[in-house]
Each structure stands twice: as structure tokens, then as C-alpha cells.
């Protein structure tokens, strides 16, 4: 029983990831982190920046069309959230700004992000519904399973779209190849007939 419980909690820890990253941002540069996110998903993040006097770091979250979803200047430590309207590649950028007269140094940036079911507070849900810890974990796994199923459905849909696109492309390439061959055959036939008439006119052939 203890062994089964161990593997159960190991499974929970494995399938319940939280994206966390830490990096150094050079002076007067920017670094963007990009990820594909499904439609209608809540994205939450928490950031912290090492303090360097005279240096400023801003952050902005946006989609591929440039629509700003969240933005803040002069950040040090805080949280943000936004809702994805459509399936897209969303990016979070950190921008360093250092005055020209100052010699800047790299700043350390840490970022933790959650999305979808990861943003739910299952502890609060358990307290409100008076659920046992094991029941809360089962609820978490149920929601995560639904999320995985939706991901697979989306992947399958994208695969079908890509396959349809490939089939259409192959059909167009085949049509273009046949059309090109017909044009070449027509041109070759025209050249033969033209040369035949030319040589007959010059009485080089009968």
C-alpha cells in the first residue's frame, strides 16, 4: 500500500508541472519567452528581478499580432495574469534600460508561470467543498486528464489540417508538373514543325 501511495504521489508530481525559468538579462537588451497556448486559458505568472541602482526593467506580454495582454514598467517583484482569446504563440518579454552615462551590469530575472488547470487553487476548492486531501488530488487529476484530452484533440485537429494542406500542396505540385510537361511537349512539337518548314523552305529536306 505504501509503495502504491508513493507511485501515486510521484505521478501527481510528474504530471503537474509548473514552468519556471531564471536567466541573466544584459544591459539594454531584451529577452522573450514564447509558448503555444490554447484558446480561453488563464495564464498567471510571478516574476522577480534583482535590484541594481539606476537600471530599469520592463515587461510586456503579447500575442503574435502584437496585441498587448499585460504590461508593466520599472518592475522588481510582482504577478501578472491574462486570458488567451485564441490558440496562438504568446510571448513574455523583459526589456532592460540603462542610462547612457551608466555602465550597466546584468540583472537576474526569475519567472514562474502557470496556465489552464494549473492556475486553480485546489486547496481553496477542497476547503469550500470540505474534501479530503486525497479527494482534492483526485479532482486535480480529473481536471488535468480533461486538459490532456483537450490537448490531444487539438493536436489531432492540427495534424488533420496539416495533412489536408500537404495533400492540397501535393495535388497542386502534381498539376503544375503535368502542366509544365504539357507545355514542354507543346514547345518541342512546335519547334520540330517550325524547323521542318524552315528546312523545306531552304530545300534542305524534301
Swiss-Prot record:
Membrane-spanning ranges: 173-193
Protein's membrane topology: Single-pass type I membrane protein
Lumenal side: 18-172
Domain of life: Eukaryota
Residue span, GOLD domain: 30-140
InterPro entries, alphabetized: Emp24-like, GOLD_dom
A GO molecular-function descriptor: cargo receptor activity
Record GO biological process: dorsal/ventral pattern formation; endoplasmic reticulum to Golgi vesicle-mediated transport
UniProt keyword annotations, A-Z: Developmental protein, Membrane, Signal, Transmembrane, Transmembrane helix
Main location: membrane
Compartments reported by the entry: Membrane
Cytoplasmic side: 194-206
GO CC terms: cytoplasm; membrane
Signal peptide span: 1-17
UniProt family annotation: Belongs to the EMP24/GP25L family.
Role noted for this protein: Eca and bai are essential, though not redundant, for dorsoventral patterning of the embryo. Specifically required during early embryogenesis for the activity of maternal tkv, while the zygotic tkv is not affected.
Protein name (Swiss-Prot/TrEMBL): Transmembrane emp24 domain-containing protein bai
Source species of the chain: Drosophila persimilis
Taxonomic lineage: Eukaryota, Metazoa, Ecdysozoa, Arthropoda, Hexapoda
